[in-house]
Amino acid sequence: MTRRPDFRRASASGRDLATEIVYTCDQDGAFAHAAWSRALSGRNPDPRERRLGMELAFGSIRRKKTLDWCIAKAAGRSIEDIDPLARSVLRVGVYQLLFMSRIPAHAAVSEAVESARRLGHPGIAGFVNAVLRRIAS
């Protein structure tokens, strides 16, 4: 059983908000709008970060099957065998790489790795880095 991430350590960035929502929907079966409201309580992100977070979260949930296929292929293992936090960070990162052309690939990879490091541990960050670089190339 993996330990639940402490999302209070998350920044107010749209990427961290999106990761929290994707994680909550995946692990708790929460509806996206309910998870979004819960994630925003007590936070006041910049309007641009709020919009980015909403696009990343809802887009990652909407494209989950496509993202999971890409992640599993690049990771060389089943999506279920990937740590839940790493899986959520990867979904948000891969969504940026595949569906958000205005975000440079290096920024998507770098921000996902930082998010994984902040919310998880160095091993998750290294794994996220390897998988995203493989997909980005």
Where are these predicted regions, by residue range?
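Class I Rossmann-like S-adenosyl-L-methionine
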Residues: M1-S137
